[in-house]
Amino acid sequence: IETPVGVVEVSLAQDGLVSVENVPSFRYGEGVTVNVPEWGAVSGEVAWGGNWFFLVESQGPPVDAGNIEALTDFTWKIRQSLKRDGITGRDGGEIDHIEVFGPPSDSKIADSRNFVLCPGKEYDRSPCGTGTSAKLACLHAAGKLAEGQMWRQASILDTVFEGSVRTEGDESVIPLIRGRAWVNGEATLILDPTDPFRFGIQDCGDSSSFKAGT
């Protein structure tokens, strides 16, 4: 499957579960601290799993489905603070995903539970494939996950991905993510070259050249 960051391989098992071999993933920074309004110093790791992530362990509101609004506010403040302080991924890559972790609701089905803030101030209903890849890379870099060892990541809704890594001989690992998914829609994106916002609305800069109503 072609993705914006490269081709990923997908395997479908007879039981309906899908395995995805993701792009090379790695931890870029550890012990990164940012001052977050109303929360003070928050420490985390910066990692690449197909997107740039800031991963936070056991800080902020409890990772529970009843705290989605509070978790959204907390992670959004982290993202804004990272941008304010110029903290980025490699080559200035914007950290546009914030992932916080807490204990699982049931240790029999998962090793950890997460909440993932995505661009647009949305959150991921799943454990997040790229986010789980970033987590696996951090665990491996910290010596907490051996090659081939299984990690079970639960989402804020308690859906679970299983993940492991294959080493590459350098700083990166190849994550293998296994889980279940359902097709819930199809879309065709049309990029009109005359549309100034065809690639989305981010930092629009000087919009004085745009006509009213565009």
Which residues fall in each region the model found?
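Active-site proximal loop and beta-alpha junction motif in alpha/beta enzyme cores
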Residues: 1-214
